[in-house]
Amino acid sequence: MSGTVKLGYQRPLNIKSGRIDMGHGAGGRAAAQLIQELFVAAFDNEWLRQGNDQAAFAMPAGARMVMATDAHVVSPLFFPGGDIGSLSVHGTINDVAMAGAKPLYLAASFILEEGFPLADLKRIVESMAGAAREAGVPIVTGDTKVVEQGKGDGVFITTTGVGVVPAGILIDGAGARPGDAILLSGTMGEHGVAILSKRESLEFDTEIRSDSAALHDLVAQMLAVVPGVRVLRDPTRGGLATTLNEISSQSGVGMVLDEAAIPVLPQVDAACELLGLDPLYVANEGKLVAICAAADADALLAAMRGHPLGREARRIGEVIEDGRHFVQMRTKFGGMRVVDWLSGEQLPRIC
């Protein structure tokens, strides 16, 4: 994404009523104008202003780097609490942060469909720029391509993030040990229900908004108190249940959860009951699961609750020895049930 091309455009982009056409992806004057007047204008920073096809930056000597990439195809593009733009920033920042890393830079790639309104694209790009600024993680390079009408769905966005892990931090999905505590940063299911309600034009007494948010500051606050956190994961597609099954399998352990301890907003619980969904399998975009030694659980929970994104944090269970790697849950009625892997796709195109 070159930031300094000046081609003497005859007229500015018609943002109000203009649309993407094939020329915007052809690499010529129209493409350069789109990049300059829409993308660079929103993402403006020292790397983009260099006008190169890549971003060059220094990294701390001896640093352990983390890289993550995430493709976003959410439908609808705009939903209560966010849009594909802010979601694409938050999602990749969170993937980097779940290694305990400080996110430093983002790259963004756009697949645009011919005929997509420039006004909607501008809204998405400005939302991305705002999310990146708020997180303090600049978008330093990128790319755009255009596909023919009918061969895309408006816009798809892929973001890639780079970060650095502080010395002494070792977080890994294989790190859970029997006796460890399982902590959750907040309520489950808002993002998935917000997407579904918008997609299906469902109305509830209280609007359900996506929880989409960047979690790296919360992670930094947690690690400042308990640097020995063993596992971090954000329960996105497949929800909490799928995430915990992944960790159990990676670590070779089992888990026992307490259903009464898992927070779900009443309106989300009601919506899930109406729609035949289980909140434990519904996607989140601004929550995390942490696993730590039981002796550190109280201190870590206090650190989480001291951050705006962790005020509703709870201790929800424990890690146990189990060669089957089952995730089980004590129900509110006193029984036990297996919380299995998600079978199939519960909510398609959720992120």
Curated annotation (Swiss-Prot):
Description of post-translational modifications: Modified by HypF, which adds a carboxamido group to the thiolate of the C-terminal cysteine, yielding a protein-S-carboxamide. The carboxamido group is then dehydrated by HypE itself to yield a protein-thiocyanate.
Signal peptide range in chain numbering: none
Pathway: Protein modification; [NiFe] hydrogenase maturation
EC identifiers of the protein: 4.2.1.-
Keywords, in A-Z order: Lyase, Plasmid
Protein name from the UniProt record: Carbamoyl dehydratase HypE
Superkingdom per UniProt: Bacteria
Reaction it catalyzes: C-terminal S-carboxamide-L-cysteinyl-[HypE protein] + ATP = C-terminal S-cyanate-L-cysteinyl-[HypE protein] + ADP + phosphate + H(+)
Sites of S-cyanocysteine modification: C351
Function recorded in the entry: Involved in the maturation of [NiFe] hydrogenases. Along with HypF, it catalyzes the synthesis of the CN ligands of the active site iron of [NiFe]-hydrogenases. HypE catalyzes the ATP-dependent dehydration of the carboxamido group attached to its C-terminal cysteine to a cyano group.
Sequence similarity: Belongs to the HypE family.
Modified residues (S-carbamoylcysteine): C351
GO molecular function, one term: lyase activity
PANTHER family for this protein: CARBAMOYL DEHYDRATASE HYPE (PTHR30303:SF0), HYDROGENASE ISOENZYMES FORMATION PROTEIN HYPE (PTHR30303)
GO biological process, one term: protein maturation
Keyword flag Cytoplasm: no
Class of enzymatic activity (EC top level): lyase
